[in-house]
């Protein structure tokens, strides 16, 4: 019985392959213009790897952590499922997020957070949830 259990474990371990993980299919990019001290805005947009699509439901979520020196108007953002160009459950135009920030002091900041989304590979018939650690760079002048 033990030999059978060990055999099953070995077979399953080989199926996953060494270092097997999901591909990162959506890469965030950030507006690079400096923000004036006071109030400003950072735009977060996304590039999707060829061959993959991003689900409209559940929504794309961007959850940010508060940091010293910056006030974030919103720390939990979710995309709208509406996409007028879409005829199925996937985005044609992946939405962007506008992040309103306030800072009294100039300097370099990094806003840490998590990006959560669901993607599919239509060719493989495979869908999955992905969680990505992000650091949004921000220069306040």
Predicted segments, located by residue:
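Hydrophobic h-region of N-terminal signal peptides that target proteins for export
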Residues: 5-18
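Extracellular/lumen-exposed scaffold segments
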Residues: 15-141
């Amino acid at each position: 019985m033990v030999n059978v259990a060990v055999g099953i474990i070995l077979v399953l371990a080989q199926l996953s392959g060494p270092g097997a993980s999901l591909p990162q299919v959506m890469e965030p990019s950030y507006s690079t213009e400096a923000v004036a001290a006071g109030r400003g805005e950072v735009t977060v947009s996304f590039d999707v790897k060829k061959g993959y699509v991003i689900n409209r439901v559940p929504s794309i979520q961007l959850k940010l952590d508060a940091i010293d020196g910056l006030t974030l108007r919103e720390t939990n953002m979710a995309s709208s499922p509406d996409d007028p160009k879409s005829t199925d459950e996937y985005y044609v135009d992946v939405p962007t997020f506008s992040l309103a920030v306030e800072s009294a002091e100039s300097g370099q900041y990094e806003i840490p957070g998590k990006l959560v989304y669901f993607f599919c590979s239509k060719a493989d018939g495979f869908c999955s949830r992905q969680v990505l650690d992000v650091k949004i760079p921000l220069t306040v002048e």
